[in-house]
Amino acid sequence: MTDIKTKTPTIRLFHVRKRYGAKAALLDVTLDIFKNEFLFIHGPSGAGKTTLLKLLYLGEHVSEGQILIDGMNLARISAKRVHMLRRKFGIIFQDFKLIPTKTVFENVALVLEAAGKPNRAIQKKVRSVLRAVGMEEKANSFPPTLSGGEQQRVAIARAVAGDPKIILADEPTGSLDPDSAASIMELLKGFHTRGATVLLATHNKELASNMASRTIYLNQGTLEITHPS
């Protein structure tokens, strides 16, 4: 496990609350997340795990409290700097969010095209990340023809194509068989070993128990347990 006692927090949450109308999704969450940490966010469905991840990349905005990322206060960030912030993140969505009418290669390339990368660099990078996740031979396939595990591999390739500092993974193994889930975890551990900070939201307690990593437990929007503390 990352020795957090010697680290400076890269993400800081101070008394964060999030409400949707009268419903509270997060209640007074205070948390430090450290550079190159692999953090599990564990809790049942509806606990606030996805909401917490969305707040970090400004997919949602806090109702109260503050979030700082590398010292940047998200409440004060200008519209021009939102894109800069989001480039820090690679996001693995629970439902993959692959475009069915685009090939595997094209789905991964979209991230780099949006960042304005030159075509030659895009070609090289996409081939590299597809090779890293074992999907190079499926580059010209379309998502509907792939298995769930294969689609998740493509989603991971897309998430890491921009060399993000932070990977947010929302239930990345939730719909996969045990063998596919294990291979996805190995991929994420590999990117963590190469320097990425990984935040993984899951309802599966076994995932967290199989790694010597810090786990926080969310229940009904409340941070109840951090282990180890």
State where each predicted segment sits.
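Helix N-cap at the start of a conserved alpha-helix in ABC-type nucleotide-binding domains
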Residues: 178-180
